[in-house]
Amino acid sequence: MANSICIASSRLSLPTLLRNVFRSEFAADLGPRSEYKSLFAVQRAPLAYRRIRGPRQFSSLTLADDIPTTSKQPPSSAANVSSVPQPDEPAKTGAGEIRASSDPSEIVGSSPRTDSAKHKKASASEATIGAKPAANESSDKKCSGAPRTSSLSVLSKSKKKKEPWQIQKEALKKKFKEGWNPPKKLSPDALEGIRHLHAVAPDRFTTPVLAEQFQVSPEAIRRILKSKWRPSPEEMEKRRERWERRHDRIWSQMSELGLRRPKRSADKFSDVKVLYDKPV
């Protein structure tokens, strides 16, 4: 019995055996579920007329397993879905309507907030329109009052008696354009030197000569000479100390250049103190 071989089993080959097995499994899977049969037939319709020649491959037999199982709706519902207009079209039309009506002037309906805002704006504009005439009237009053006050001030100034210094200032302005307010200001030492030179030799150091020497107007020299202000003794002492420091600084610079500084033995021949010896 062990050595005996079945003739029917010897006729079976491996390809035919595998074909029978997969056919039975495929029929068992698709038998109770008719909806999958119809769906598979709809999706694989172009391949229905083809004949498979030769042994079937594993990739062609496993197509049923690759079919997605998520879409469980019947073919009737799929047909209904295909007959229903797609949702993209109304969405597009709605978007077009929204874009067309995005202009605020074309919007028919408005919310209560927008109505209240419009009402407030209208009331504010009316208030401003009503307030403008009052503002214009007040501005007209101010403008009409300003010329009156200016004219009154001019009249009061003209009627008021001028001071002597004002009369002199006006006369100087007419006679000397820059004499009453010279652009060049002289130092106190220069003013003292002008007074001293004019006091020592009035015939030599006249007003035009001093004006040319100090580069100021003759009127400025005249006012300097006419001035009665004199410095106090303390101020004179400070000026003398300042002049001495200036003298030392100048001679230190000259000694750096190679010039000799005067000695004390030559002080009696110097005329430095002449400025302080003679009265002003």
Swiss-Prot record:
Pfam families xrefs: Neugrin
Subcellular location: Mitochondrion
Main location: mitochondrion
Alphabetically ordered keywords of this record: Mitochondrion, Transit peptide
GO cellular component terms, A-Z: mitochondrion; nucleus
InterPro entries attached to this UniProt entry: NGRN/Rrg9 (IPR010487)
Residue spans crossing the bilayer: none
Ranges of compositional bias, category Low complexity: 73-86
Region: Disordered, residue numbers: 63-166
Keyword tRNA-binding assigned: no
Similarity section: Belongs to the RRG9 family.
Name of this chain's protein: Required for respiratory growth protein 9, mitochondrial
Record organism: Neosartorya fischeri (strain ATCC 1020 / DSM 3700 / CBS 544.65 / FGSC A1164 / JCM 1740 / NRRL 181 / WB 181)
Gene of this entry: rrg9
